[in-house]
Amino acid sequence: MINLDEVDASPQRDAVDNWHVRFGIYLPGITFNKGYALKVRVIHEADQFIHGIEPKDFFLDWANGSAYDLWSITVALTPDPASHFGQNGTYLYRYELLLGNEDVSFWFADPFGRAAGLGTLSAFIIEDNPQPFPWTDTGFSVPEIDDMVVYELNVREFNRDFQGVIDQLDYLLGLGVNVLELMPVTNVKEDVEWGYTPLGYFAPDDRLGGPLGLKSLVDACHQRGIAVLLDAVYAHTHPEFAYCLVYDATGEPNPMMGVFAGEFFPDRPGTDYTKEFTRDYFVQLNHYWLREYHVDGFRYDYVPGMYDGPVGQGYANLVYRTYEDSKALARFDGGNGRSKIIQCAENLPDPIGIMSQTYSNCAWQNGLLDRARDMAQWQYVSADFAHRLDPDFLGYPQVFANAASGETFPVAPFQYIESHDHPRFINEFGLARNRDLLGESYGDRSRFYKMQPYIIALYTAKGIPMLWSGQEFGENWGLLDWGVGRNLFERPLHWEYFYDAAGKALVHLHRVMGGLRRVQRALRSRGYFYYYDDPAHLQDGVIAFRREASADGAHPAECLIVFLNFSDSDAEVWLPFPTAGVWAELVDGTRPAVVIAQAGQWAPVVVPSNYGSVYKCT
């Protein structure tokens, strides 16, 4: 089994207060008795580009008989007057593998490195009196699935780095957000990258703020009741990841990579979960992130590349072991031995199956997004859109149950109309004349109002609402369907849109709907969802449905009726109201109330064009 205490670069003081660093790395099948030698090359960051100062080389010892062929050495940081070596600061290191006197792999980073430099370099820090991070999140509890509103963001595009995200957390709270889904934040080779070709799985990227920056972000989120979800790319890696590079170069049997499930890259294999080392690596990785960084779960990218069935060795095994491991941490305690850890599967071919058969309590699914985009593009309204707002109708499970152990927990799909994988939703309504540097057209933001009924639908749907950063003020970047320009081109948010008429209107609506989602139990309930299936509604461009929450002892029963008008004209909508009383409109709070004398009475409601209304009996 992988022991994280014997790998990485670990600074320590000796008995006379001198610094030493212990280096350790597993290279299964790479052994001294085959003629291999391994050295680590170390340099102080301040000396990295100084003429005449070379890295210091140290050869590691192979531990004969170790399960995964551990190589290690403890190095004294003896001060060198001609350089910064031996002084406090950041040190960079990399490994070099030789066979006899010949280089086999000239340069590879530590696959267990806890910090990274720019590019293919690992790092460690020497400082006087290092202190553990001062966490302040002892009382934080992960939100229940039904209470979640998720905000997906690319840290660099959102606001530069981890500190930039911290600066905007109170803004996100105003949108009703209580879960951040961070696109990959671990070390990558390129300066501009989405992060889906990881190089250092244990190291937050230094360009985003490194380990300290990410811990500060998670702690700041927890102070505000916001959970943090990491995008976990466990099906494929960068070709220069150590367990690709070394074994491609040596021809030795690869302990991690191989053909397993649906390969993401056609020209090279991904991670192979039939191999014990692969399974152990990612279980230990999740264990580390949950404890060292206090993250609250994972959005597993491209699950088809990891999944070999509900009792397989890949994805199902990983999420089960991670679920059981999370029970030791108080923030996940859901009572009766249940963990609230967030494990979200991107298994687009079968989101229903993955939530029904594995320890995944949520999943991405493109059903609502696809229907919304088709409606926007072709200017029609479909009953299928209403059904997409009710996952129960589509056969999604409400609960995962392990018949063998008796374990159960609630599950729900993510609901979204935008994600990082798709062009901006506002672009479906028309394109502007100006283009970005790749020649992609921006969306026409003058048609922002067409988004409004979709936003109201998103916050009033069953399932877990997810926003893609910038959606709330009409971000309008284009996006290529393929090619390096898709994920190697930076698209920073146009924060200036927040101040114009379109941005103000959209942000206001997101804030109102986020507040309603937070306050109105019926919008978070697993209770009754009733679609008013009336062909006349569809002809007028209208969808209407009802959300209900049963009385639970502490709260009375609650009923809301939602009207969505996708047309360019105000619409008068008739339907039967289920209870007598005064029905008040909640979105704007300025529209006339509807007075119902008896249950089942039909009454009209005028719904504004390209907008919606939510009525509640008061």
Task: List the predicted regions and their residue ranges.
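The feature marks proteins involved in alpha-glucan
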Residues: 1-32, 49-152, 160
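Surface-exposed beta-strand/loop patches in extracellular or lumenal glycoproteins
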Residues: 22-31, 38, 566-581
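Substrate-binding/active-site clefts of carbohydrate-active enzymes
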Residues: 111-118, 131-132, 136-148, 154-342
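Conserved alpha/beta catalytic core and glycan-binding cleft of carbohydrate-active enzymes
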Residues: 113-121, 294, 319-482, 518, ...
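Active-site rim elements
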Residues: 303-311, 435-448, 494-504, 600-603
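Aromatic- and carboxylate-lined catalytic core of secreted/periplasmic carbohydrate-active enzymes
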Residues: 494-536, 611
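C-terminal beta-strand-rich structural cap/linker in extracellular carbohydrate-active enzymes
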Residues: 597-618
